[in-house]
């Protein structure tokens, strides 16, 4: 599964809300620009990637959502043969607007991606996907 999903640049191939992605590189410092079906654009920078441990970490350098300090991690944890767990987490600060609404928008993005992964790659019995998100308090 890491071969399919572990590339920092692969998100447009499997995430249903991403309509386009531009970027290149798989080393820290690589960037990707995402366009979403609701018209938003995100620019993200890879901060760490470890193929042996099957994870990468990234940060948003530009977003049209009122957020700051966005740091995400995408990890595939190998389980028993032919099983794995995808763990996709993020931390961010909501800078303005309704904190719950903004957090719900990010959560919906993660949820859509997790469901797409499950639909495309899970074999009976269904592989468990975990989604966790922590929203930091708004800056004053």
Predicted feature descriptions by range:
Residues 9, 38, 50, 133, ...:
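Generic low-complexity, intrinsically disordered sequence content enriched
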